[in-house]
Amino acid sequence: MKKEKEWREIFMTIEKLEQERNLARKNGNSERLLVLNDIIAKARAKETAGKKKIELTEQLVNDTLVEYRKMLKDGIKQMPEGHSVRVMYEGQLVILEEFCPAVLEDEVQIENLIVKTLYANNVEVGRKNKGKMMKVLMPALRAQYADMDVAMPIIDFMISQAESAS
């Protein structure tokens, strides 16, 4: 599945999601229809979330997909094995993965991204510098759709290592 995502289009548009939703409706696939309706509603909510309407870009749609994925994964973690809600979330996650951009979860790749970003921005690692670190790291981590549940412990470990070295 990961290989498939490499050659597939990187960005998902709201139009593509709506086409898939219409196909699911036509085929009578209620679970797929439910997931797609929910994603489209969340994306449309972002479009009108401020005082003025913003354009629903591919980036916003992808951000919505990644947020929805995280919500499902968190729900799966909270439910015991075999629980009906967990089974439902797992099914929804399988459907979502078809549309969701690849999320960076590999610790080594995330650590490399963190180190490169800090070096490129000439930011020193340290607890007193954490605000500045996060200011440069967050956009880079979000751009790569890095899993923040993996990234934050790496950042905290790097800070503790830097403090113990000094």
Where in this protein do the model-derived segments appear?
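Charged, compositionally biased, marginally structured helical/coil segments
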Residues: 2-166
